[in-house]
Amino acid sequence: MSEKYVVTWDMFQMHARRLSERLLPASQWKGIIAVSRGGLFPAAVLARELGLRHIETVCIASYHDHNNQGELQVLHAAQVPNGGEGFIVVDDLVDTGNTARAIRQMYPNAKFVTVFAKPAGAELVDDYVIDIPQNTWIEQPWDLGLTFVPPLSRK
């Protein structure tokens, strides 16, 4: 990936709250299925904003490092009735669409949303907030840490 898009906690919360607004009224939802790990963070915001307490997870591993997506491994699948009807499936990002296709097969009746979407996968989700170019790596706030940076005069 040649470009980077750095997301701060403030930006992330703002975007996740905007996504929550689009999911109102909350009474239509039975719960949330968070795609682990990236979907855990927006799931917490959605749960708070929509007043939902029933949160499940689906654990799918696909990224092995910043540049390489590998074969999908379903490590855990939430057991919900009726193909996920009445549930929101949430992930931080839809990228190539590989994970999204697997999710769609597992929960065909759920509402599938992400905070960010790249062109190759955008059509696979029901809603998202921010368009990201395909060749851009997203640096999410939970993957970053604060470190000391020396003054320019000391370099």
From Swiss-Prot:
GO BP annotations listed: GMP salvage; IMP salvage; purine ribonucleoside salvage; XMP salvage
Known cofactor(s):
Mg(2+)
Q: List the SUPFAM superfamilies.
A: PRTase-like (SSF53271)
Q: This chain belongs to which protein, by name?
A: Xanthine-guanine phosphoribosyltransferase
Can you list the GO cellular component terms from the UniProt entry? cytosol; plasma membrane
Residues annotated to bind Mg(2+): D92
Please give the Gene Ontology molecular function terms for this protein: guanine phosphoribosyltransferase activity; hypoxanthine phosphoribosyltransferase activity; magnesium ion binding; xanthine phosphoribosyltransferase activity
**Subunit and interaction comment:** Homotetramer.
Q: Cite the binding residues for xanthine.
A: D95, I138
Judged by the first EC level, this protein's enzyme class is transferase
The portions of this protein that span the membrane are: none
The EC code for this enzyme is 2.4.2.-, 2.4.2.22
Q: Which InterPro entries match?
A: PRibTrfase_dom, PRTase-like, Xanthine_Guanine_PRibTrfase
Q: Gene of origin?
A: gpt1
Q: Which residues form a coiled coil?
A: none
Membrane topology per record: Peripheral membrane protein
Q: Name the domain of life this protein comes from.
A: Bacteria
Reactions that this protein is recorded to catalyse? GMP + diphosphate = guanine + 5-phospho-alpha-D-ribose 1-diphosphate; XMP + diphosphate = xanthine + 5-phospho-alpha-D-ribose 1-diphosphate; IMP + diphosphate = hypoxanthine + 5-phospho-alpha-D-ribose 1-diphosphate
Q: In which pathway does it act?
A: Purine metabolism; GMP biosynthesis via salvage pathway; GMP from guanine: step 1/1; Purine metabolism; XMP biosynthesis via salvage pathway; XMP from xanthine: step 1/1
Q: Which family does it belong to?
A: Belongs to the purine/pyrimidine phosphoribosyltransferase family. XGPT subfamily.
Could you say which residues bind 5-phospho-alpha-D-ribose 1-diphosphate here?
Answer: R37, G38, D91, D92, L93, V94, D95, T96, G97, N98, T99
